[in-house]
Structure formats: structure tokens, C-alpha cells
Amino acid sequence: MQLNSTEISELIKKRIAQFDVVSEARNTGTIVSVSDGIIRIHGLSDVMQGEMIALPGNRYAMALNLERDSVGAVVMGPYADLAEGMEVQCTGRILEVPVGRGLLGRVVNTLGQPIDGKGEIENDGFSPVEVIAPGVIDRRSVDQPVQTGYKAVDSMVPIGRGQRELIIGDRQTGKTALAIDAIINQRNSGIKCIYVAIGQKASTIANVVRKLEEHGALANTIVVAASASESAALQYLAPYAGCAMGEYFRDRGEDALIVYDDLSKQAVAYRQISLLLRRPPGREAYPGDVFYLHSRLLERASRVNEDYVEKFTKGEVKGKTGSLTALPIIETQAGDVSAFVPTNVISITDGQIFLESNLFNSGIRPAVNPGISVSRVGGSAQTKVIKKLAGGIRTALAQYRELAAFAQFASDLDDATRKQLSHGEKVTELLKQKQFAPLSVAEQAVVLFAVEFGYLDDVELSKIASFETALLDYSNRNHAEFMQELNKTGNYNDEIKDTLKGILDSFKANSAW
């Protein structure tokens, strides 16, 4: 069969008409330098601050410096094989991490990828790591407690749901132990927990995970790990990733607790990135926006009202408030709380628990310094019974510290001073507590009642610990119903006062400790 020229031209025209041309606009650039996890890229004219840049090998970098002729970006992950001349492209997306209940009980890295060898995670979607904190109208005042299980904390520096309470102290003063015990104490409270480990040894993180598992708290906890071997970029972003995972629960009318361990290392990682990006250094070589680094993170911890939750869930959840409580940890050098990062975080948070190495080394653990530890909003969230019974403890300790300093120089002391010193010593002894041994509200109430109403006056200092153990054992064994009811309500009235008095009277009359 022969085709003439007209048929051929018609056929070509038909094919051309059917040919579908899809033009795809891509914003690409070329790597011009790679050093210490920082890449400089030529091109990318439409890139945005914080945008993810796709690199070869299914990796990403985050654009942090937008300059006239180049873009400075930080690589998320290994960068040894990246070379000058490689092509990269914009994604039009910012960093997002998986969120949802499927993450509970798992250990993940900054990007939300599982690192515990337990298989894939079923998530409920993705959330951006950088989110604007809820506004003033969306918030509600803090009026519900978070029980840490520590007598010293719950009585003197109470923490409320939606509060930011800083744990600050030198290395090896029990900061992580306090935070981990607070997480363990939430295993039956319904509060979901997130533990963010920044710049720690992998062995230390593994030990924390093991302890949480041993005490039945891991099923209720998400562990976000950015160990010391991870890049500075992942250490810098880890707290924001953990916060996004916590906000998932807050925005759905639930309560969550997040521990950042610790923000000093995050600030150091951010300083490293900033200096490599040639940003101008300020005090202690930190960049000018290191305050904003922490303020935008900690402001996201809040208690949100019913309207916010209803609006966020599109009417699925009604009449519930949500909260995200933050326990940031800061490590000081030789007790210097006036350094740059500690003062920044103290000014952002709603109070601080100051742990002192002198107290820790002298056997007072938790080593809480009651003089400069404070909770600015927790008082209104404190359980009624604890609030009523703990009023005299801080005063007694403050007077004891003052008198103890004078007593070193005085040879003869009057009876009132001796009595006050003895009482202070006993209160200090009573506030000591072993790790992984949190007390319930009712147990704390019984102990504080004994302090408040003079039941310790005739107990020798060396027998305080055995007195407390025997008292709690007696209360739980013989008055289990009352203890359960007190744990449930947390109330304090004349009837409860009389019952507590009866417990203490019968215990002292019948028990040898």
C-alpha cells in the first residue's frame, strides 16, 4: 500500500494533535561547597526560609540562610558523599514529622523514623515541626495538677497542666532522674509523655528506655532521640519534632507532658550551625536569635480551651480542654544560673526547680533548693489537700537554713532555736526520696500531715525514714478505702482532717518502727 504526501501530512498532523506536552517547572540549583554538614547552593531563586531541599539519595537539607547569590542549607543526615556540582531542587514543603497514637511506646529519631527495631509505625498523619503557638484567646488558665510523685516538688514547687517548669542544675545533680520519675508517675494518670533526648550518649538513652519499660511507663511514652553522634541539625530540630508529637494530643482535648533533656545542648548545636553559616556571633558566641530559639518552642506548651479543641477537631471533641506541659532541662556550669542560656530559659518559663550539687553530695535527694525554686502558676493547680498541708514546709526549711548558718558560730542556743533547728532537720530528712519510688497524693498527704501537726517531734532523726515507710505501709494496709478516695478527690475538709488524725494517732500508739 502506497501513501501519498497528503495522507502522510494528515497522519503527522493527527499525531501532533494527540501529543500531550506536560511542562514541569522545577526550581533547581547546584551545590558549590560542602563543609561540616553545611552546603552552599547556587540557584534556587524561589526557595523559602526553612524549606526542605531534595538532595541526591533520598535525603534532605533545610534552607536557613537566604543570601543574594547563594543559599546556605543544613543537611539532615550523612553528607560525606555530597560533592560540588551536584544538582538539588526545591520541594515547596517544610519539615514535617509523623504524629499519632502509633508512636506511643516507640523510640524514634528527629524525623520520626523508628530506631528501636520494632518495625514500621502506623501514624495518623504528619505535622510541621514549626507551628505558631496558640494565641491568648485560645488559652485557658492552669488549674489542674501534674503529680510528679516527689514530696519536695508537689508540696513546694507544684506543676500544673499546661505549665513550663524548668529543671536546672549542674551535671550529676539528678535532673534527668526527676524528669523520668515524673514520666513514670503518669502511667495511670492518662497523661501522654514525650521524652526528647538531645546530644546524649546512645547508651544513656538506651538506659532511660529500659527504665521506662521496667516501670510500665514506656507504653504511654514517645522517646525522640538525637544522640551525640547525630548531626547538629538533628539535635537542633529534635525538641520541635517532639513538641509537634505532643501537640497532637493537646489539640484533641488530651493532656501531654514533654521533657526536653536538655536545651543547653540544643543551644550549642544551634550555635554550631549558626557559626558555620557565618552568622554574626553575640554573647558567649551564641547567635542573636538564641532567645527566640527557646521562646518559640516553650510557648507551644499551653492549656487550650474547649472552643479551640472543638474548632480543631471540627466538632468531634466537645467540652474538653487540652494541655501540653513542658519540663525543659538546663545544665549549668558550677551553679552559674546567670549565664546566657540559663537566664533566657528562666525568663521564658513559669518557674524553676533548682537542683544543687552541694545538697546532692550531702545525700539530700532530690536536691531541690527551696530558696530559689519557685512555681509561678502551679499554686492554683495544686491538689487541695497538699496545698493545705504543705504551707508550713517552705517556711520551716527557709528558717532552718537561716538558723543553721548562724548556729555554726553560736555556742549556746535557746530552746526555741534548738526546736526549730531540730524540726528543720527532720523536714529535710522527710523530703528525701529514692528514685523510682513516687508517692500518691494520699501518701504525700499522710506524710505532710505528720509534719504539720507535730507527729515527728518525738521521733529521732535517724528513724525518720523507717517511720515514714512504716506509716505509709500502715495507712495503705489498714485504711485502703480512705486512701483510694483521697487519691480520687484530693479534697481537704474537717472530716478528712479527723480521719488523718485518727490514722496518725493509732499508728503512733500501736506501731514500733
Curated annotation (Swiss-Prot):
Protein known as: ATP synthase subunit alpha
Function: Produces ATP from ADP in the presence of a proton gradient across the membrane. The alpha chain is a regulatory subunit.
Native species: Haemophilus influenzae (strain PittEE)
MF-aspect GO terms: ADP binding; ATP binding; proton-transporting ATP synthase activity, rotational mechanism
Keywords for the protein's UniProt record, in alphabetical order: ATP synthesis, ATP-binding, Cell inner membrane, Cell membrane, CF(1), Hydrogen ion transport, Ion transport, Membrane, Nucleotide-binding, Translocase, Transport
Similarity comment: family membership: Belongs to the ATPase alpha/beta chains family.
Principal location listed in the UniProt entry: membrane
Catalytic activity: ATP + H2O + 4 H(+)(in) = ADP + phosphate + 5 H(+)(out)
Mode of membrane association: Peripheral membrane protein
SUPFAM superfamilies in alphabetical order: C-terminal domain of alpha and beta subunits of F1 ATP synthase (SSF47917), N-terminal domain of alpha and beta subunits of F1 ATP synthase (SSF50615), P-loop containing nucleoside triphosphate hydrolases (SSF52540)
Residues the UniProt record annotates as site (Required for activity): 373
Residues the record lists as binding ATP: 169-176
Pfam family, one: ATP-synt_ab_N
HAMAP family: ATP_synth_alpha_bact
EC number per UniProt: 7.1.2.2
Keyword Cell membrane: yes
InterPro entries linked to this entry: ATP_synth_asu-like_sf, ATP_synth_asu_C, ATP_synth_asu_C_sf, ATP_synth_F1_a_nt-bd_dom, ATP_synth_F1_asu, ATPase_a/bsu_AS, ATPase_F1/V1/A1_a/bsu_N, ATPase_F1/V1/A1_a/bsu_N_sf
Annotated localization: Cell inner membrane
Assembly and interaction partners: F-type ATPases have 2 components, CF(1) - the catalytic core - and CF(0) - the membrane proton channel. CF(1) has five subunits: alpha(3), beta(3), gamma(1), delta(1), epsilon(1). CF(0) has three main subunits: a(1), b(2) and c(9-12). The alpha and beta chains form an alternating ring which encloses part of the gamma chain. CF(1) is attached to CF(0) by a central stalk formed by the gamma and epsilon chains, while a peripheral stalk is formed by the delta and b chains.
Record GO cellular component, one term: proton-transporting ATP synthase complex
